[in-house]
């Protein structure tokens, strides 16, 4: 994993990696197959290069993301296509990559970051501005390249409550008196604070359910050269995020459906949200 984090898992990178370790390719293969250990000299040399301690390498406590940030390929700022018309934040992208690693492993996370030319350093700031292209491209890529189903994308969205629990979102929502108030805060205050890509309108809010409609702001869509922001995959992620709101109150997830969607030809994306005590009946 350290080799991949340092972006040395390609031909020329591997040669440099072997030079750092001071061993042959054959010896390295034997190490990977657990047929021989790395020498203290190799470990010390690697630790010096990665700016970590030899003990961290031997004990498996290296901060892999820190290594990727310092040594990995990719720009340490968002690539230009994801920086124009940046009316959103990176928080959803960050929690989505965390879900990818949890479900598919660190290799898929690393390969996906490399595909988009994004360095781990970019994913250290939840408040960093971005546009909707990055999550749109990521969601489509995960479905086409890694066969993620709509259900898995939904769970990717739900995973946001895990990553956000110790952030401003978690702090604010955990103080809500009940689920109804939590949704009102999430949609009317937090969503509008964190992004200005879509107009969110609550058309119904009762003690047992909520109806939400979302429409792209025209000026943002035009700036990105699209009619509607996002895609059906992003809608699945958003549905999962909406379902996770009760988690901030330590309650089960809500039931969320999307009967109307602009990506299916409708004029709005409409989400019908049934609160957990109703969904469980």
What are these regions (language model features)?
Residues 22-38:
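Recognition helix of helix-turn-helix/homeodomain-like DNA-binding domains
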Residues 39, 59, 198-239, 249-281:
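Short terminal or interdomain "cap/linker" segment that borders an active site or interface and mediates
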Residues 41-57:
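DNA major-groove recognition helix of helix-turn-helix/homeodomain DNA-binding modules
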Residues 54-83, 157:
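Short amphipathic recognition helices of helix-turn-helix/homeodomain-type DNA-binding modules
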Residues 124-234, 260:
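Amphipathic interaction/junction segments at domain boundaries or subunit interfaces
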